[in-house]
Amino acid sequence: MKKLWIVILLLLPLFAQGADDVIPIPRVEYLEFARASADWTWDNRDSLLTLWRDNFDEKSIFGYRPPPRFLEMATIYATLYDYEGNIEYANRAKQVLLDYSEYKKMYPKKEEKRRPDYTNGVPALPDFFTNMRYIRPYEVLKRKGFLSDSEKKEIEKVIAHSIDYVLQSQEWGAMNRSCLRAEALAWAVRAVPDHPHTKYWKSYERALGFDNWGNWEIEDATIYHGVWLYALLGYADAKNESKELFHTPEMYYYAQYFLHLMCPDGMIPDFGDSHRIQPNWSRFLVFFEAAAKAYDDPELKWAAATIGRKFVDFSKVQSIGLAYLLLDCYRFGTDDLNPAQPTILSEEVMEDVQGKKIVFRDGWDSKSSYMMLNYRDEGDGGVIFRDYLRDAIPVEEEKMTHGHADEGGICRLMHDGTILLVDGGYRDYMPSGMYGAFRQDYFHNRLCVRQGKIWMGQEAGEWRYSPTDHPKIEGQSIIDYLHNAGSYRFVRTQKIDFLTFDDFDYCRTKLIDDKLGYQWDRVVTWVKDPGIYIVFDVMKATEEEWMTAANLWHTRKILDQGDHWYLTQYDSLTNKKYDPESNLLIYFPETHYRLESVEPEKRNYQNEIVISQYTGQHFELGEHIGFVTALIPQGLDEDPRPWIDRISFIDSDNPGDGMSVEIKLDKQTIQVGMKRDMRMDMVRDYRRPKYTYESGKYNCGKVETNADFFYTEKTKKKLSFTVVNVSKAYYDGKELFAQLPSQFGLAFDGSSSEYGIGKARYWRDEIDFK
């Protein structure tokens, strides 16, 4: 009869949902998976123990590693006993707890003596990622009166020794490893309240918990966001303060933040220390289930259902680690919410202080178009936390902490269910791989700048060097030129602008590198029909210096290429076969004094290719250069060549003032353009406004304006246009917009002149234009 009810409960959502809706996972399905996984582990415990012994690594950098799986099994059985009263489950959990300390005898005495942290003996629970999984089942069995006094004494001895060991090393701050320690301490305080060391545990627990509770996490990495959030849930659970946790504004923020980062791949894209194959989806699943219940939010329930349906295979009951997490989905979740797919499209996620992400999207299903740009810098928050880690552990390649030099980088581009651009991965060995793999700037889809000028060489027939027959002279590899140890260099970032409309979306971000002496603006425009991305990159020197700038794009495979264009594809991800349904055409329409290269690289745990467009020169103070890239998603059988004829670069009449791209389609011509230096207007400080139209205007083809950005779409009879931060705009001599004059008094020079023209935020219109 029990099995019949389970089947009925599993089928109920099928009747409640529409055909296009994601089906939520009933809580009982989580519970029964946990039960089945615990049973499988119990039935196979002898062979699992043999496997552990056969593969035991006494030289592990992490020291003693106890057998996996058993603590998760014990937690599941203890919880089931708590719910159902099955004595067999309690006995199984107890046996794990009583036997667990015996396994450390596998660790050789000679290795024990080598480690200064083992001066008080080898801990049975050396890993703060999992030691709460020993304490949780003990708390249940003790609370239920299932253990004898001698059994409690033996288990509490193991807990005390292991918790004291955790406190021999110190990691604190608003980050995952600190929060895991706080969680373990909270469970120890709850389960062993009368131990002589409990007062010390309480002190440490409060210190670590205080840093994380109601605070901004200092990490910027998908994997570790998941670890931190799940540890916070466990910490609150141990203290019976889950409701209070979700009342903090930071937790509500993070629930919305990660929801709005969700991509068509069914998960939050990987950024920072992460990679696509294991972005910690299981911990995010628990978090979204818990947050959906806490906030009664159908969209958060949609995120949980999407992740669960994408990743969980309920037939693979061997996954006891997953079962442990899914048990918490049962404990923290609810069946009283129907998922609702979010409706907001392109947006800032969530703002330009903490989140610092921009997402372009046209929907929320697996075939939607999606781009995510990350401009998160280290920022000003969490200074003491970041400095402590910098000073205590070898993390010189990280944007403190677990972040990458990916500021301004495009971490993910998807179209029609296919990944076209992806982040570079975590690392291939500790602390980082060669050249800081994969954290340094040259592993990301971004502009990279170095002081000094690269040796360019020359192609045959060029006149850069003196030999009279003008031979080919090999230049320097741009990647070799950029390479270094991978040590992270502090920079600052800003969002300059973000706008979204029916026909296009636009963003502008800035990176400021005070030490190298440059600023970099990245302007991304998504032209929704025909669905292409125009990327402008402007590097401005803030010092007089020789500099080299390289516009880098990474891929797995080049299918075809021609003059300044490359048809690319990802056919594997993290060295695992991937079946794409689309390709990406990368095209550089601006080519003057720009060199290009295609070089092999090790990235994302596989052999990849980096496509570079670069140049080098001496920069005067304030001088700038620009790069232009068109990113064009393509069908697998689509010929890229017609796009090359349709897309052209249109420079400003006075080179350096602006730049634009023209896209010729069958029924209309689109032009996208931008002002290179947004401060070029500023010519006077003695009165306001500081600018005039004449000081800020530039011409790109038929467009004249002082706008920071413009977008025009011309058909045979109509002209639609958008101009941003603008006083005036003209098209082919016809005035499109003119801001009316206003009064600007109180001039600093004491003059009586009050006439002035300000700038409109933006102006959009459509006019007849033949």
Where are these regions (language model features)?
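Polysaccharide-binding surfaces and accessory modules of carbohydrate-active proteins
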Residues: 548-603
